[in-house]
Amino acid sequence: MQPLSRGEGRRQEGARLDIFAKCGILFLFILPGLPGAAGLQKEMSSMKYAFDNANLIDGTKDMRVQPGLCVLTDGGTITDIVPAGTAPAGYTRIDLRGRYLLPGLINMHVHLAGSGKIQKKQRDNEKLVRRILSNPVSRAVAYRMVCGFARDELLGGVTTIRTVGGLSTFDTRLRDEIAVGRRVGPRILAANEGISVPGGHMAGSVAIAAGTIDQALAQVDAVHAQGADLVKLMITGGVMDATERGVPGELKMPPEMVRAVCERAHALGYTVAAHTESPEGVRVALENGVDSIEHGAK
């Protein structure tokens, strides 16, 4: 995949923003992601704002459009919702002029190593990742692309993402840079590299290939040292790297490894997410301590 030129990136970003403008829709706290310095995101999180004259869609089960409202924020936190035109003194007023205001969306399953577009043909991702991470120049290019994919999430209205397998320590690095205002992007809960087995799903690309329980536990300790937010397992085969029918749901990780990883992760205060694409994979995950099932396809 070739990185966009600066001009191409600006044109695509402008097109996305134009779509939002035409639809008259704003996602709450997406404003820091609009054109401007990353410092604006940090500034927004430390000031008082009144988003006035909004048509509010609050995200509840029985949500209806609620016209004529003003959303008050302080330090990046919603503090009140009041009638339009009644914001108290001390707030910077932003007149939405009847645009629709939504809560930020949350994407619970993200791999920032990819754009999310459909892969047209099989690739040797392990070989590709090894080549990318082998020198500083290609690493820098790859990290820039990861940052761009995260920004795309924000521009699409996603204000929080949960990564479940990434390149090296890119995800925690980007999470921390966004948190201090160096980069523009959503809040990130990061797993960094997941844990697979030799020949398993994403082994060698966005997950390490653990041949033994000790190697799997070493990766749990590694992501703990990296400051990750969760642990990711690849229990069954997957669709994207399957070379023959039946592989996606095939059990790859032994149950005893799943249990050992979950016990170590839980002792360190982590939850464990697991890629499973078969009833057998789901059963192994649930019986051995996994906290969340990813995909769960049959």
Report the location of each language-model feature:
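N-terminal metal-binding scaffold of metallo-dependent hydrolase/deaminase domains
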Residues: 26-29, 39-88, 99-102
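Divalent metal-coordination and catalytic microenvironments
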Residues: 54, 71, 76, 98, ...
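Metal-associated gating/positioning segment near the N- to mid-region
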Residues: 100-177, 288
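Active-site gating loops and adjacent loop-to-helix segments of metal-dependent hydrolytic enzymes
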Residues: 114-142, 184, 192, 196-204, ...
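Divalent metal-dependent hydrolysis catalytic cores, especially in the metallo-beta-lactamase
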Residues: 135-136, 145-171, 185-196, 228-242, ...
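Short, acidic/polar
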Residues: 142-150, 211-223, 277-281
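Active-site core of metal-dependent hydrolases
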Residues: 198, 237-298
